[in-house]
Amino acid sequence: MFNDLLSELTKNILEHGGKKLIVPNEFCECVSKQGNCKLNSWLWDVPGFRRWRVTRLDAGDRLQVLNSVAYPNEQNDMPIMGIDLLWFEKKQKLVAILDFQPLVQDKEYLDRYFDGLKSLKKSFNEFNSDMKSNIYDPTKYFSPWALFCKGGNFEAENILPKIFSSFLKCYWKNLDLSKANENHIKSQEVSILHIDYDKYSAEKDPAHGLFSGFFGKEWSEKYMKEFLFPLSLENINS
């Protein structure tokens, strides 16, 4: 599960001039001590982006994960792209979130960047669920039009591939849109908001518990802070 989507994402990145960056060996591939789970990580240098990372976790029929986050460069105030897909084979359960994660929640910013996502949410009822969370504040770094699905094999096999392709196309359109318009947020503020995003995510992301169960707490903390959310180590006032 998700290998075809990973290939599509990789193809998209390459078509937009992406080049692979070196990932430290300890993060590039990690296998659990029990040998029942493998994690692979990729980091991309993509024109227009400060950082683009991808994670693929394969725990067999227990769990499959595809996660990707793309941070535009500081001169671009467009939303951060977030993809988080989980498949539980034994339970035949899909949990999927795809979102353009807004740096701010004001109307002018949302009107500029979210027409495409609004349209997708209307077009795919299966991904029109309300995202309720005891972990995240849905008004902080999530859009009102986040594509969220709790489904089964039908959604995983038939709906997810379609919405995944459309989602990526919409995000690339946002990149073109951002180049044609003056930023709504100044670059210095964009940098600060990216740091805040990483700090918030490093604290809230439930993946830490998941990784700890497979790879141990020490490795997981290092992976969270050094690979997934490295700006969480920055001083936001510096």
From Swiss-Prot:
Its EC number is 1.3.7.2. The keyword Oxidoreductase applies. It comes from the Bacteria. GO terms for biological process: phytochromobilin biosynthetic process. GO terms for molecular function: 15,16-dihydrobiliverdin:ferredoxin oxidoreductase activity; cobalt ion binding. It catalyses: 15,16-dihydrobiliverdin + oxidized 2[4Fe-4S]-[ferredoxin] = biliverdin IXalpha + reduced 2[4Fe-4S]-[ferredoxin] + 2 H(+). Keywords: Oxidoreductase. HAMAP family: PebA. Catalyzes the two-electron reduction of biliverdin IX-alpha at the C15 methine bridge. Belongs to the HY2 family. This is 15,16-dihydrobiliverdin:ferredoxin oxidoreductase. The gene is pebA.
